[in-house]
Amino acid sequence: MSLDCWLYHPQLSEVAQIADAYPDLMIILNHVGTPILGGPYRGKADEVFKEWKASIGDVSKRDNVFIKLGALPIRMPGYVGDRSLPPGSEEVATAWRPWLETCIEAFGPARSMYESNFPVQKRWCSYQVCWNAFKRISVGASATEKTDLFAGAAARAYRIENVL
């Protein structure tokens, strides 16, 4: 059995508690733990990143937790601003890189999987741009790491390795 969890970054400790209580349960943390950058967190991106990163590091210590990488908006800290053209994969990769690389470093490629989150994601970029951004972020990864990020980790998390 597996459990997909979508929650916000202040709730990440709850995933750790569930993972500790049920070590045989495969837990998949969706959307990089959804860092909140609006509402009461608006203008506090550096503080949010620091808090989120520490929580991701803590949750990643549980071997039964995997993480889905994606579902981040483009208009995050470092975003260039509104433009008449949609962002390309290079711009998306630049915006997402610090968040996704933090997750990959914490969980390792073997427990990290890319996710598209379409059709919701089309609000920020096209399907092709999203996946090309993932390819850009993965450019320095080994062939084995790329296999994990793009398919292997998901197959293990959902126990469907026989389909690869």
Task: Please report, for each region that a protein language model flagged, where it lies by residue.
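Catalytic pocket-lining loop regions of alpha/beta-barrel enzymes
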Residues: 1-113
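Short histidine/acidic/glycine/proline-rich micro-motifs that form metal-
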Residues: 73-74, 118-121
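Mid-to-C-terminal alpha-helical segments outside catalytic/metal-binding sites
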Residues: 101-102, 106-113, 120-164
